[in-house]
Swiss-Prot record:
GO terms for cellular component: spliceosomal complex. SUPFAM superfamilies: P-loop containing nucleoside triphosphate hydrolases (SSF52540). Gene3D superfamilies: P-loop containing nucleotide triphosphate hydrolases. ATP-binding RNA helicase involved in transcription elongation and required for the export of mRNA out of the nucleus. SUB2 also plays a role in pre-mRNA splicing and spliceosome assembly. May be involved in rDNA and telomeric silencing, and maintenance of genome integrity. It is found in: Nucleus. The keyword Ribonucleoprotein does not apply. Belongs to the DEAD box helicase family. DECD subfamily. The gene is SUB2. The keyword ATP-binding applies. GO terms for biological process: mRNA processing; mRNA transport; RNA splicing. Residues 91-266 form the Helicase ATP-binding domain. Its EC number is 3.6.4.13. SMART domains: DEXDc (SM00487), HELICc (SM00490). This is ATP-dependent RNA helicase SUB2.
Length: 443
């Protein structure tokens, strides 16, 4: 089945957007530092005549965004002083309720764009859901829910709930059965949300904002895309749609825009520049049999706060985790073979710094934001260049320093390495025998 099959189409009447909204989008982007100069940030405003106009970013504070005072207090409590590049460009336009399609590499604060925007717009009504956020993994849903919790700490009337598969649906139904617990903001995975909508437990008739995080992953998989479409059809036509990802191929962009009306398109760094600034990247050529010894050596010799080690299967994750613990390394394993409650428990344990080493499959490869990770090791090479970007993006979040090391043990691994170098126009050096200076990757 092609990407274009079974896609949402609005009627012509629904697709009409006022010139005022289009002008507001372009004006907001312009007011936020628009300049005809080359840079790494490309903005296509609503109905922009020329795609690829460049925007230079001025130093801005969160106060310039005209956010609610309660949000500004929470932002200050979190220790944020200045918005990131993507936040400076997206937030002023998004709070005007214009649709947004945004690609920005890992760690640049995309989540805060939609969390702050939707909280700023929200006027909570008891028993009414106004904001719907969907993502493709349970861990990411849990993390987004926590972001809403910390930014809404001074908005006591705002209720947020997270719903995902792998847990008893009855618990979700109980939350949705009482006006006292019914959420104003729902975060979840498409399968569980679709089930709740079908059972008429979750009403989407009052949705004002519809958000997809890591949207390419969700719209690329046919089953997940169908769930997204079914949920989308249950929401009002007159709503804001925002989609975000670190990778948005030329093929997936038109699919995303099928859900939108005249969106502001923001691409922070073009496709070839998506590798991460501040992240030192190396590879080590070795045999499969040498991997465990080399991993032990790296963990003994490298300085790191926390490390995430990626493997290709749940079986290998369990075996490697067991081996590390036998060698007295403080390790945990997170993968799809672990029960949902246990996965969340282990995720919290790692995030709260109770464990320093996490062995994971690609379930941890996208969107998970743990600020202390500054070392990512590909024990097994990823399947493709996009997966590589999402994996190594766990280290060096929000522009900080980090280190990634990939084990290359076969011809297929070397081919993937060459694909990564070609795709991102980088040359990954071999890891030096003498190691690397900790000051190059430790913040």
């Amino acid at each position: 089945m092609s990407h274009e099959e079974d896609l949402i189409d609005y009627s012509d009447e629904e697709l009409q957007t006022t010139d005022a909204a289009a002008a507001a989008a372009t004006a907001a982007a312009a007011a936020n530092g628009a300049a005809v100069k080359k840079g790494d940030l490309t903005v296509s405003g609503a109905r922009a005549d020329k795609k690829g106009s460049y925007v230079g970013v001025h130093s801005t504070g969160f106060r310039d965004f005209l956010l609610k005072p309660e949000l500004l207090r929470a932002i200050t409590d979190c220790g944020f002083e200045h918005p990131s590049e993507v936040q400076q460009v997206c937030i002023p336009t998004a709070i005007l309720k214009v649709d947004v399609l945004c690609q920005a590499k890992s760690g640049l604060g995309k989540t805060a764009v939609f969390v702050l925007t939707t909280l700023n717009q929200l006027e909570p009504v008891p028993g009414e859901c106004s904001i719907l956020v969907m993502c493709h993994t349970r861990e990411l849903a849990y993390q987004i829910k926590n972001e809403y919790a910390r930014f809404s700490k001074y908005l006591p009337d705002v209720k947020t709930a997270v719903f995902y598969g792998g847990t008893p649906m009855q618990k979700d139904i109980e939350v949705l059965s009482s006006k006292d617990t019914y959420p104003n903001i729902v975060v979840g995975t498409p399968g569980r949300l679709n089930a709740l909508v079908r059972e008429k437990k979750l009403s989407l008739r009052n949705i004002k904002a519809f958000v997809l995080d890591e949207c390419d992953k969700m719209l690329d998989q046919i089953d997940m895309r169908r769930d997204v479409q079914e949920i989308f059809r249950s929401t009002p036509a007159d709503k804001q749609v925002m989609m975000f990802s670190a990778t948005l191929s030329q093929e997936i962009r038109p699919i995303c825009k099928k859900f939108m009306r005249n969106p502001l398109e923001v691409y922070v760094d073009d496709d070839t520049k998506l590798t991460l600034h501040g992240l030192q990247q190396y590879y080590i050529k070795l045999s499969e049999a040498e991997k465990n010894r080399k991993l032990n050596e790296l963990l003994d010799n490298l300085e790191f706060n926390q490390v995430i080690i990626f493997v290709k299967s749940t079986l290998r994750a369990n075996e490697l985790d067991k081996l590390l613990r036998e060698c007295n390394f403080p390790s945990i394993a997170v993968h799809s073979g672990v029960s949902q409650e246990e996965r969340i428990k282990r995720y919290k344990e790692f995030k709260e710094f109770n464990k320093r080493i996490c062995v994971a499959t690609d379930v941890f490869g996208r969107g998970i934001d743990i600020e202390r990770i500054n070392l990512a090791i590909n024990y097994d090479m990823p399947a493709d260049a996009d997966s590589y970007l999402h994996r190594v993006g766990r280290a060096g979040r929000f522009g900080t320093k980090g280190l990634s090391i990939s084990f290359v043990s076969s011809e297929d691994d070397m081919k993937t390495l060459k694909d990564i170098e070609k795709r991102f126009e980088v040359a990954l050096p071999e890891y030096p025998e003498e190691g690397v200076d900790a000051s190059t990757y430790m913040a």
